[in-house]
Every structure is written in structure tokens, then in C-alpha cells.
Amino acid sequence: MSIVTGQAHRDGVLAQLPEFASSDNRTLLIEPTGRDSMAAIGLAAYVVRERFGEDAIVGSFAADHLIARPELLRDAVETAIGAARDGYVVTIGLTPTEASTAYGYIAPGPALNDGDEAGAADAERGARRVAEFVEKPDADTAARYVAADYLWNAGMFIVSAGVLASHLARLLPDMHARLETIARVWGTPAFEETLAENWPHLTKIAIDHAIAEPVAADGGVAVVPADAQLGWTDLGDFEALTGIVTEAGNLGEALRVDSDGAAVFASLGDDSEGPLVALVGVPDVAVALTPDAILVTRRDHAQSVKAVVDQLAEQGRSDLL
């Protein structure tokens, strides 16, 4: 297993998963800077390819997904591995629970069955060609997608290391060459220096745009619909986090009066819960406290928190990011 994360999260990852500090079977890869998902996934995939060969199957999964029934995800991944061994880039599609505008969508095409035995086997297990990836839609378009049995794109990809490298060599040859250069010195004293030299030159692009969309246009991407009972939650915003916290209790000391659906998140860096937060007449809000900042937002505005992050970046407040 490999984890790719930024320098700021290194100590936190090792505190939760100390076995990654020194293990032949577990690898912690630290990005010098954020270069979007293609660079992060590519780094891990090319190191796996260097260590285990072209046929090694790699899967990429975000760390901020909550899965209520992981056994159903395992079933989908097993199906995806079969299609990946047949040369497809495979993604896991999720059955929408609402007409959300927060996620991209996948238009599933026909079942994988090119007249060969492998294609028929993949089709029997539920794998389908991807007809199209579509960006986050407006509300009306999202409703049409759900009615047409589109799937949510959760950004989970399974592919052989060699197939990924061949697509990247064709579509982004400079990135391919630099990732090969980095992976070639994995496990040697030259790795950190080689990573630092090449990393800033990698194209900053999501894997969806770099590989998934163009390869899907050529018929090379498959989707495996996960079971509708999977119980998937994207914990990428306070709307989702608040939904979890209000069921499990606040992550901080809070007193709520006429404030149903509100939640408090406290992280003061010293294992303390921080001050008592009293919420009166403010339902469905999220309050986050850190040692140097406080955020208050309505749950239905959770997606807009990115605007605060952008403003802080423009002001050079890297200490708060």
C-alpha cells in the first residue's frame, strides 16, 4: 500500500499509521508541493511499476471518503481488477442518492463484451464502457443525469501500472519521462533530490482530464457500478462532516439551544476540546475552531469555503492554509 500526501500532513499520517515509517510493503510518498491528482497518482503508480513490473494493478482512492459497507467496495474493486487486467482504465461509479451539483457524473455505455471471452466475463461482473465523463452540473442537468442512470464520479481508478504509463507517455510525454526518472531511483539516496528537481515541472492536472476523459473517448475506460447500499460519503466539506458529527456527537464541547443540525469542530493542537461553544437559534451551522482561526458557515454554504481559502492564498496567509 502507498500513501501520497503533502509535507504538512506527513507527521499526522505517521501518527495514525506508524507502520508506514519503515516497511517494505507500505510506502509513504511526500509531494514537495501540490500538483493535482495526476502527479500524485502517477508518482505512486510509477514507483509500483518500478518495483513490481508493468502488470501490477494500482488503485487510487481518496483519503476523505467514508464507506459504511467496505465489503461492497471490495466487491466492486475485484470486478474492476478483472477489467484492468484486460487493459482498461477502470473507475468505480456510485449510484446517486440525490441530484447533487457537487460531483461530476459518468455516463455508462454498453456492457464490456467485444466478442471475446475476457470482455464477456467483465460484462457478467457488471463492468461497462464509459460513454462520457461530465463536469459538475447545475441542478436541472443533475436531475436529468440521475433520471438517465448516470453515476457519480468519486475519483476512484484501477488500472495496470503499464497501461497507465502507456497512456501518459502518449498524452503527456514530458510528465511520463520525469515520473520514470523519479521512480528509477526509488529506494536510493538520490530519490529525494531527483524528486525535488523534477516535481515542479510536472503538469498540474487532474487524472480525469489527463487520462480518463481522452481515453474514454477512445473506448478505453470502463466503469463498475458499486452496490447502491455502499453508503459512500465524501467528507470533503463541512456539510458532510456535520452530518456525521451530529449523529456521533460534537468534536468539541458544545451546548445547543434551538440549533438542530449544528456542529462544533475543535482542533487546538494540544488534545484539548477548547472553549465551550454555545449555539442558540442557529440551526444547521458548522463552527470550526483552531488555535489561530475560527470558521462559521451554514451547512448549505459549505462548498463556498473554498472562496475563503482562495482569499487567504491571495493575501499570502500560508500560515492559515
What are these regions (language model features)?
Residues 21, 50-53, 59-60, 67, ...:
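Solvent-exposed alpha-helices and their adjacent loops that cap or buttress functional pockets
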Residues 44, 64, 106, 160, ...:
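Residue-level signal for inorganic ion chemistry
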Residues 1-62, 67-72, 94, 300, ...:
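Conserved N-terminal catalytic core of the sugar/cofactor nucleotidyltransferase
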Residues 27, 129, 222-224:
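Conserved beta-strand segments of alpha/beta enzyme cores
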